[in-house]
């Protein structure tokens, strides 16, 4: 059996979650990973369209502003995202942070998958011919924080 740092982190987070979910159902592992998966696809669609206004209800104010700056920066350079066929292979909760010292509850999700992700000139056609060399495996960490009875995306790493 191959042990990795991430598998150890998943085990530790899982142990914490099993205790936390008994006190509050928001800590349900399945709901947390599904929320991460859902928001991932919404963010990718919004980046592809270059319009993130619909994401406000899924991101913290800080997370929304960071994403908006990224999109605005691309606009100023006449660039755009091309995101096609993203496939998630795994979503794992790797860290759990119960509320402490005026910081809200939070968790970090590791999202692994594969897809076409590239930034190109806005005026170029968005054909996928020749983009097969842009298919990449990805592994990203997203920080979520609790707001009421909901998890919001705060930071994309």
What would you call each of these model-derived segments?
Residues 21-27, 52-59:
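Short, exposed beta-strand "edge-strand" segments with a Pro/Gly-rich flavor and a Y/T-containing core
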Residues 38-41, 45, 53-157:
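Structured, amphipathic secondary-structure segments that form assembly/contact surfaces
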Residues 1-38, 42, 121:
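Juxtamembrane and targeting peptides
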């Amino acid at each position: 059996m191959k042990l990795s740092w991430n598998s150890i982190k998943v085990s530790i987070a899982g142990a914490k979650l099993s205790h936390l979910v008994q006190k509050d159902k928001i800590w349900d592992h399945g709901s947390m990973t599904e929320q991460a998966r859902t928001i991932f696809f919404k963010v990718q669609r919004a980046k592809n369209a270059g319009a993130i206004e619909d994401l406000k209800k899924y991101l913290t104010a800080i997370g929304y502003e960071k994403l908006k700056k990224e999109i605005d920066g691309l606009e100023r350079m006449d660039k755009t995202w091309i995101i096609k066929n993203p496939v998630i292979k795994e979503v794992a909760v790797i860290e759990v942070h119960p509320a402490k010292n005026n910081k809200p509850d939070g968790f970090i999700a590791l999202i692994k998958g594969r897809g076409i992700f590239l930034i190109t000139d806005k005026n170029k056609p968005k054909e996928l011919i020749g983009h097969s060399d842009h298919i990449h495996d990805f592994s990203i960490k997203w920080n979520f924080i609790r707001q009421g009875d909901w998890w919001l995306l705060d930071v994309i790493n």
